[in-house]
Amino acid sequence: MHFRNFNYSFSSLIACVANSDIFSESETRAKFESLFRTYDKDITFQYFKSFKRVRINFSNPFSAANARLQLHKTEFLGKEMKLYFAQTLHIGSSHLAPPNPDKQFLISPPASPPVGWKQVEDATPVINYDLLYAISKLGPGEKYELHAATDTTPSVVVHVCESDQEKEEEEEMERMKRPKPKIIQTRRPEYTPIHLS
């Protein structure tokens, strides 16, 4: 992100106004402006209706500070009005800055990894050697009890299935024993051309 520098403009105040009549009625607006004209004659107002804010620009910072001291958190038409010094935002460039390249290498890897990057080693797989030992002792159709049953737990028994290769060989033998199906040709329908009839 680009560097932002907030500076306060001590010759401008922002008034947070709860009463929306200021933005639509000229009499209310004149009353509001008269509050601040007592502190400075060369004053300008900018009304921001959607934000319910008014920017008040004074000719010097002393009159702005005096107005804030006297009018901050005072009531205007029955509602509290708050005054703050306006902030001006100075950005180093008028263009948007690119985002920080924190973890972008994961999205599209560069030619070389960033400094300090270490490859994470995959954890070794969990191998149950008891199960492998039991399977190695068994033949097809036999079973092996890994854990005997107790009052609270069931027993764990391994059944070894027949291999797929043996099944495939049996199916192939059955196919060879079956007679080949006879394909009966479909007879062609009778056709007489229209121009001959």
Curated annotation (Swiss-Prot):
Keyword hit for Transcription regulation: no
Keywords, sorted A to Z: Phosphoprotein
Keyword Phosphoprotein: yes
Molecular-function GO terms, alphabetical: calcium-dependent protein serine/threonine phosphatase regulator activity; nucleic acid binding
Annotated InterPro entries: Calcipressin (IPR006931), Nucleotide-bd_a/b_plait_sf (IPR012677), RBD_domain_sf (IPR035979), RCAN1_RRM (IPR034906)
PTM info: Phosphorylation increases its ability to inhibit calcineurin and decreases protein half-life.
Pfam families: Calcipressin
Regions of compositional bias (Acidic residues) in chain numbering: 163-173
One GO process term, biological-process aspect: calcium-mediated signaling
Gene3D superfamilies, A to Z: 3.30.70.330
GO CC field: cytoplasm; nucleus
Taxonomy, superkingdom: Eukaryota
Residues carrying Phosphoserine: 108, 112, 163
Region (Disordered): 163-197
Record's function text: Inhibits calcineurin-dependent transcriptional responses by binding to the catalytic domain of calcineurin A. Could play a role during central nervous system development.
Family designation: Belongs to the RCAN family.
Subunit structure: Interacts with RAF1, PPP3R1 and PPP3CA.
Name recorded for this polypeptide: Calcipressin-1
Source organism of this protein record: Pongo abelii
UniProt lineage: Eukaryota, Metazoa, Chordata, Craniata, Vertebrata
